[in-house]
């Protein structure tokens, strides 16, 4: 711990940042401006050292950005200051791109890492507002409000999400997953409220208060990596619990004219408290012992087929060779097992039901899917027969074990082209399904379970389960989930209920009836 603290606090970047900050504090004529300078020269570089690889280009970017911030104190010409502020803005853009790259390498999974990604992206917004302040751009607000927005996106929108992400590497719970999106949306909602709607600002602050106090409670229930880190992080989060109350008073005054709180008071108390206690103690706490990510590296086989399926060969009887590879079949009706192993002996009838709120999107997508002949579901809920064929796929083209394509049609239109395979991890076999798309492929990794005589296939299970988009070498987890429930209702007749959600919200339900030919 001491070695790590020494390597971070006494790194050339940190020492230079502290030196530049001290020099800036001597040169500045407005001491309150130092709250943003502290973030730009000390807090942001320290946090980035915990996130970015120590590559030469990253170090050079940091040095250039810090030097530009310091030179703002000594360069007298407005043109020179604009150039220096622009350089810093480019640096924040670089950080945002790195956060975006992290996100696209992983997708909608792991709220802790998403929080870090969003924090890095938000820094660019802070850089834009800082440039607007230095350049004197008319944003529609006073120069002070423009500067306050810049500091808002350095502390509330960068330091807090990064700190929240590090905390999530140590603590994961339903409450944590609830407050993360609230805190991540908070900076934007508060900024929009300040700009356009005092009432929205008031509501946003109320939500923010709920999330912050929940975070404080969670912090006091969490075991940290060292005793000193425990003290520092709890104090840092607790400081937010105090300063956010003054934000509420300020928002209440703007909305209803009650409990007058001036900008001057917010600068002296709210800003200084956030800078010294939340910012400084929080950064020191994470620098002590940076928690390691718990994000798994996905290494399951991915279909290499993109666009229109080519290389479909001879007819294949079933979606799987042996259902027993996936699940214990002794408790399942024989018809379910037979259907999966001899799919070509069955007829399939479907009724597609789109959620009312999603129908406009479904209609728009139908214009695209008709041309793609993929994921081309009917808009009507009328019961219709899906005809199909199962064809073997060249394993050398696909890259997975023993792939076969299930090609389903409604009349002359292809509805699905799904290439089935499987892979095994940690003693469990998963269904590995690919749906080729232009220059990409949608991948569904499903876990199979036999429960009370029913077969359940779900993308919300263990290990690799999920729905992904594969493009090039990137594998992006989508905010989608699917769940199949298959029963034998009458001897020889199966029903299957297929439900899909986006961001946890139901948007599609397909009812299938399956009977032998």
Q: Which residues fall in each region the model found?
A:
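Hydrophobic alpha-helical transmembrane segments of multi-pass integral membrane proteins
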Residues: 1-310, 494, 498
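Soluble ligand-binding/transfer domains with enclosed cavities or grooves
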Residues: 305-510, 515
């Amino acid at each position: 711990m001491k070695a790590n603290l020494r390597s971070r606090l006494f790194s050339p970047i940190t020492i230079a940042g502290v030196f530049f900050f001290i020099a800036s504090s001597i040169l500045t004529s407005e001491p309150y401006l130092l709250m943003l300078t502290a973030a730009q020269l000390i807090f942001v570089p320290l946090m980035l050292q915990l996130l970015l690889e120590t590559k030469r280009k990253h170090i050079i970017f940091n040095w250039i950005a810090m030097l530009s911030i310091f030179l703002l104190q000594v360069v007298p010409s407005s043109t020179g200051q604009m150039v220096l502020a622009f350089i810093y803005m480019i640096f924040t853009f670089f950080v945002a791109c790195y956060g975006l790259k992290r996100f696209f390498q992983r997708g909608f999974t792991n709220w802790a890492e998403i929080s870090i990604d969003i924090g890095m992206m938000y820094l660019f917004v802070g850089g834009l507002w800082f440039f607007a302040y230095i350049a004197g751009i008319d944003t529609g607000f006073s120069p002070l409000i423009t500067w306050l927005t810049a500091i808002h996106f350095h502390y509330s929108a960068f330091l807090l999400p990064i700190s929240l992400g590090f905390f999530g590497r140590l603590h994961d719970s339903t409450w944590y997953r609830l407050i993360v999106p609230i805190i991540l949306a908070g900076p934007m909602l508060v900024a929009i409220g300040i700009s356009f709607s005092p009432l929205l600002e008031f509501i946003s602050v109320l939500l923010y208060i709920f999330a912050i106090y929940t975070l404080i409670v969670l912090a006091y229930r969490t075991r940290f990596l060292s005793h000193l880190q425990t003290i520092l992080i709890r104090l840092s989060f607790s400081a937010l619990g105090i300063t956010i109350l003054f934000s509420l008073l300020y928002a209440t005054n703007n909305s209803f004219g009650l409990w007058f709180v001036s900008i001057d008071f917010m600068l002296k108390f709210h800003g200084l408290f956030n800078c010294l206690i939340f910012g400084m103690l929080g950064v020191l706490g994470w620098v002590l012992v940076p928690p390691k990510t718990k994000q798994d590296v996905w290494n399951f086989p991915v279909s290499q087929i993109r666009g229109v399926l080519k290389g479909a060969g001879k007819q294949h009887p079933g979606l799987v060779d042996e259902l027993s590879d996936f699940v214990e079949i002794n408790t399942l009706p024989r018809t379910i097992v037979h259907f999966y192993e001899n799919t070509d002996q069955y007829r399939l009838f479907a009724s597609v039901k789109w959620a009312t709120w999603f129908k406009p999107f479904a209609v728009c997508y139908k214009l695209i899917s008709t041309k793609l002949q993929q994921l081309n579901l009917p808009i009507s809920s009328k019961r219709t027969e899906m005809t199909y064929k199962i064809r073997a796929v060249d394993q050398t083209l696909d890259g997975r074990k023993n792939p076969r394509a299930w090609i389903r049609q409604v009349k002359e239109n292809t509805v699905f082209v799904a290439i089935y395979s499987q892979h095994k991890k940690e003693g469990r076999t998963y269904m590995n399904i690919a749906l080729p798309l232009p220059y990409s492929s949608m991948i569904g990794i499903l876990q199979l379970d036999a429960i009370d005589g029913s077969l359940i296939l779900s993308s919300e299970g263990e290990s690799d389960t999920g729905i992904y988009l594969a493009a090039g070498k990137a594998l992006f987890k989508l905010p989608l989930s699917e769940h199949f429930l298959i029963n034998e209702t009458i001897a020889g007749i199966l029903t299957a209920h297929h439900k899909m959600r986006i961001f946890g919200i139901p948007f599609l339900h397909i009812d299938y009836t399956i009977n032998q030919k």
